[in-house]
């Protein structure tokens, strides 16, 4: 996948999907990410860990907490939500007042997008920075939650089961709301894709509306269990 014919500037991909859904595999196999700056929670967690090790005010409570354990991961997740540090990190990357109008970096947001208001808030911020709705694209990685739970238990960096379940539910709900235009305040109108069982479904192209009564929309709805 290479949105807008591989444009080198001004493109944004929201990679949507619950924890352990296979988003990293999707990037490796299906997305031409070489020209994108990737923003993901792991990078933010590493910054938080470094801050705690240096004794920076506000991160003392993370000292000695291992983010690679279920308990530690829950602590880091809650800290990210409480401080909104992930949003601030994204703003620092995107808000460069000295760049030219055609030099907005391509961005790949690799996160669950499972929280209410997450897609709306980030997309609105991007529009304020100068990005365009038709250049904000969606790639939803859909995986059965039981498969995600199994994957999570088999990898070295594990999360608590409730994080896996809730992130899967939240990501699915937000994607459905966006797809069927219930998320009216989100300025997102780029290419829409869904990845299921390592197959890519192209739902719509940039600038077009989703044909909610068409065959593709019905196929997606059946896959997601809403038809």
Question: Which stretches of residues belong to each language-model region?
Answer:
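Conserved GTP-binding G-domain of TRAFAC-class P-loop NTPases and closely related GTPase folds
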Residues: 145-227
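Hydrophobic anchor at the beta1->P-loop junction of P-loop NTPases
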Residues: 15
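Conserved substrate/cofactor phosphate-moiety recognition/catalytic segment
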Residues: 27-105, 117
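Conserved phosphate-donor/acceptor-positioning beta-strand/loop module used by diverse small-molecule
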Residues: 129-152
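Acidic, metal-coordinating catalytic cores used for nucleic-acid/nucleotide bond scission
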Residues: 110-119
């Amino acid at each position: 996948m290479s949105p807008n014919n591989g444009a080198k500037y001004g493109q944004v991909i929201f990679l949507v999907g619950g924890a352990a859904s296979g988003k990293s595999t999707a990037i490796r196999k299906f997305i031409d990410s070489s020209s994108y700056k990737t923003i993901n929670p792991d990078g933010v967690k590493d910054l938080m860990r470094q801050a705690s090790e240096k004794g920076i005010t506000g991160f003392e409570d993370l000292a000695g907490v291992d983010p690679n354990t279920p308990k530690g991961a829950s602590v880091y997740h809650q800290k990210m939500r409480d401080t909104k540090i992930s949003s601030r990190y994204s703003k620092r990357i995107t808000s460069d007042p000295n760049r030219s109008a055609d030099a907005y970096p391509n961005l790949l947001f690799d996160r669950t997008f499972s929280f209410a208001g997450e897609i709306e808030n980030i997309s609105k911020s991007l529009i304020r920075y100068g990005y365009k709705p038709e250049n904000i694209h969606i790639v939803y990685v859909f995986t059965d939650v039981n498969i995600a739970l199994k994957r999570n238990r088999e990898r070295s960096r594990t999360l608590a089961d409730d994080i896996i379940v809730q992130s899967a539910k939240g990501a699915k709900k937000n994607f459905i709301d966006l797809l069927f235009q219930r998320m009216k305040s989100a300025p997102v109108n780029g290419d829409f894709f869904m990845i299921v069982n390592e197959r890519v479904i192209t739902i719509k192209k940039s600038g077009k509306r989703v044909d909610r009564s068409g065959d593709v929309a019905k196929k997606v709805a059946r896959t997601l269990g809403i038809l």
